[in-house]
Design a protein with these regions (language model features):
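Substrate-binding/access-modulating region of protease and related hydrolase catalytic domains
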Residues: 85-169, 175, 179-182
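Subtilisin-like serine protease catalytic core
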Residues: 4-17, 21-35, 43-95, 111-114, ...
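Protease-associated
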Residues: 186-192
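Short, well-ordered turn and helix-capping elements at secondary-structure junctions
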Residues: 2, 43, 63, 122, ...
Length: 192
């Protein structure tokens, strides 16, 4: 993102926890990956066998070192806490996501976590599975964390945010970012 630091906000002293496929220790994250927890392969060192997690972390907190400051994330000074909940194909299990939520609640103070980015969607069909995941997100919000969640790629029809078919107002506690496709163009939803 160009000119993200024009506002003066850099994310310094803000811990951003990213749930995704992991993180590659790229030069743009030097000294700012505070923690890495692997709920899939249980490895110790940061890695990303898919690249989606690294991409998301770059959008959030890349500091532009590799591009000599030309391309940065939206919070180039933030600390990154990365929880790998998706495998190399981008798939994951509800149980791993819920375990990651518990980890965040147990460690938020230690790592200074203030924002949680959940870059996962769901193809769950059972309403109970959705209720459990939404309850977990609500717990994070109730603990004082800002939760930013992907709207998902599985929306059943235009203007729906996720695979449950819930409208944005059904999720009062999380911020959603989404786009939808119409006539081969990607557009931001009008409800944002």
């Amino acid at each position: 993102m160009k000119n993200s630091d024009d506002s003066g906000y850099t994310g310094k002293h803000v811990g951003v926890c990213v749930l995704d496929t992991g993180i590659f220790p790229h030069i743009d994250f030097t000294g700012r990956i505070l923690a890495f927890q692997d709920f899939i392969g249980h490895r110790i060192r940061p890695y990303d066998d898919n690249s989606h997690g690294t991409h998301v972390c770059g959008i959030i907190g890349g500091d532009g070192r590799a591009s000599e400051g030309r391309i940065k994330g939206i919070a180039p000074g933030c600390s990154l806490i990365v929880l790998k909940v998706l495998d190399r194909t981008g798939n994951g299990r509800k149980e791993d996501v819920l375990q990651a939520f518990r980890w965040i609640l147990e460690n938020k103070r230690y790592y200074g976590i203030r924002v949680v980015n959940i870059s996962v969607g769901t193809t769950c069909r059972r309403a109970e599975d959705h209720r459990v995941l939404i309850a977990g997100v609500e717990q994070l919000w109730d603990a004082g964390l800002v939760v930013v969640a992907a709207a998902g790629n599985q929306g059943p029809k235009a203007r729906k945010c996720d695979s449950t078919g819930k409208q944005p107002e059904d999720y009062h506690s999380r911020l959603q970012r989404s786009a939808y496709r119409t006539d081969c163009h990607i557009r931001q939803g009008t409800y944002l």
